[in-house]
């Protein structure tokens, strides 16, 4: 790893220990430090995303002001907003999928212990079990280190963990679509449709596409999102 050759005081593990200690030594995880501070437990449910841009204009033809004060509140008829927030349905379904995976692992662990006591079976893990372990352990490994951090955190610190939540819902949907049961296939299709629809619905907040005040309010489902 190139950067380890530049500073040889720390090895690979020590570098990450220093990074974690740096974050743990900083305090001030509250809105008084920054309005968009979001503790780690707010990330999974997307309760506090982050606004990067908010500008208003009187019409679509009017260029956005590069410098200068914004228009008075309620005066602009067109809103341009960029939010650092994920697709809410993808986010929430991912958390549900992880919970289901945890339940599956717990059930398999209990079943294995019961069968082992009765029949002395050797442990053989299925491919699905390995996938479940991979997703749950990697999600936990990327989220739990932030539990002890007291500095001002933001939603983007969750990016390395949420990837595994996305993979969890993708795996769950794949299982549903490949099921023999019509109801499960319908669940898989419904989840996919809801995620795609939500992406299109919230796309203006990702790309700063023009919105009316009413359209902006429709997308701000919770006051903590603003």
Task: List PLM regions with ranges.
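Membrane-lumen/periplasm interface segments of specific transmembrane helices
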Residues: 1-76, 198-201, 205
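Transmembrane helical bundles and short interhelical boundary loops of multi-pass, membrane-embedded
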Residues: 1-13, 29, 168-170, 175-226
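Membrane-interface anchor segments at the N-terminal boundary of transmembrane helices
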Residues: 52-131
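Alpha-helical transmembrane segments
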Residues: 115-121, 149-151, 172-182
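Membrane-interfacial loop-to-transmembrane alpha-helix junctions, especially the N-terminal start
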Residues: 117-138, 183-191
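Hydrophobic, membrane-inserted alpha-helices
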Residues: 138-146
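Membrane-interface catalytic loops of GT-C/OST-like multi-pass glycosylation enzymes that act
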Residues: 146-159, 207-210
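Hydrophobic/aromatic-rich transmembrane helices and adjacent perimembrane loops
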Residues: 153-174
């Amino acid at each position: 790893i190139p950067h380890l050759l530049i500073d040889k005081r720390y090895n690979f593990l020590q570098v990450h220990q220093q990074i974690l200690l740096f974050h743990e030594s900083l305090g001030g995880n509250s809105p008084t430090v920054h309005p968009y501070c979001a503790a780690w437990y707010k990330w999974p449910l997307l309760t506090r995303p982050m606004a990067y841009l908010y500008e208003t204009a009187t019409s679509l033809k009017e260029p956005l002001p590069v410098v200068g004060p914004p228009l008075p509140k309620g005066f602009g008829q067109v809103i341009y907003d960029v939010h650092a927030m994920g697709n809410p349905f993808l986010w929430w379904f991912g958390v549900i999928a992880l919970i289901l995976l945890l339940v599956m692992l717990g059930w398999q662990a209990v079943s294995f212990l019961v069968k082992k006591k009765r029949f002395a079976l050797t442990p053989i893990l299925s491919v699905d079990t390995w996938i479940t372990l991979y997703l749950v352990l990697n999600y936990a490994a990327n989220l739990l280190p932030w539990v002890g951090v007291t500095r001002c955190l933001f939603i983007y610190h969750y990016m390395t963990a949420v990837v595994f939540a996305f993979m969890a819902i993708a795996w769950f949907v794949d299982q549903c679509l490949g099921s023999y049961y019509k109801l499960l296939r319908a669940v898989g299709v419904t989840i996919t449709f809801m995620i795609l629809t939500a992406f299109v619905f919230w796309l203006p907040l990702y790309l700063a596409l023009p919105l009316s005040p009413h359209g902006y309010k429709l997308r701000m489902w919770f006051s903590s999102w603003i």
